[in-house]
Amino acid sequence: MAGIKPGDIVARLSYGKDIFFKVKAVIITDQGQRTALLKGLDVRLSADAPLEDLELQPAEQVLFYRHQDIHRCNSYFRRARERQEARREAYLTWMDVAAGSEGTQRGAPGEGEGFFELPGRVLHVDGDAEYLDRCLHAYQQLRLPVRGFFVAEEEQAFRVPELLSRYTPDILVLTGHDGLTRQKGDMSSLDSYRHSKDFVAAIRAARRLRPSHDDLVIFAGACQSYYEALLEAGATFASSPARILIHAFDPLLVVERVAYTPIHETVTPQEIIKDTITGEGSIGGVEIKGKLRLGYPASPHLRFLSATSG
């Protein structure tokens, strides 16, 4: 369609207008075809499409699309917060029982006011500045301490060592956009993916400094990423086993589950997958110990939870 320009919201006619995209750029291919470079509005997908396959979306349709996505995401965030509170109560009860068996007294059962929580600290490196801003807001909603940085996928391997050394997180997120190339070809080749090779390089850079899954939990990937290669490089969790799309907030929901699982408990991939927006086939990984610790005593001067961008 003529008149489509960077910043427009469009949908692909050949895919039944199933996903809305933002136009990043319009280029002319070697074959002389005017083609739009696209990024998903709510999924972490990079794609391209000829202009004649695109339909510009009116403002009211975009508003409705965004409203539906916000409503869906809020239901997952609400469930995560409810799970946090239930885990907190269970953890305090467990400590009451442990204290009783040792002949000590922590306080009245279920009291817990003297304790404070230390969930796992997150370093979120994102190849999409808009998604990073949305994720930082969501991290605040989920009470997760995070440092966030916009770093293009191609540059992440070069920035990660310095960021890891500076912020020493418990959990590292390496994400942005990905997707199978239009030619696809051999799905066991990194060349068939737009950014999987960049995520692999970033994972390896991180693992040279922090080789243990127990020391540093890594989530890596985006839509249709080369799941097996990411795990082999050292990711704890990765996308996408079934080469399907993942939601922009799926990495964050994985992180929340790990960050708020107590250190004496193991969190499994099966548990994590059911908490993601996209669900089965989107994400997988290996079991890992949680990162939540309780501290004592609480102090009005302690301020652990923050979401900041670099």
Which positions does each model-derived feature cover?
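Short beta-strand-centered aromatic/proline hotspots
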Residues: 17-28
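Proline-aspartate-enriched helix->loop->beta-strand connector
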Residues: 164-177, 235
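Short aromatic-glycine-enriched beta-strand elements
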Residues: 21, 32-37
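C-terminal functional extensions of proteins
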Residues: 245-310
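Catalytic cores of nucleophile-dependent amide-cleaving enzymes
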Residues: 199-246
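Short helix-loop-beta junction
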Residues: 136-147
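Short, well-ordered loop/turn sites that connect or cap secondary structure elements
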Residues: 2-5
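Intrinsically disordered, low-complexity, charged/polar segments
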Residues: 41-103
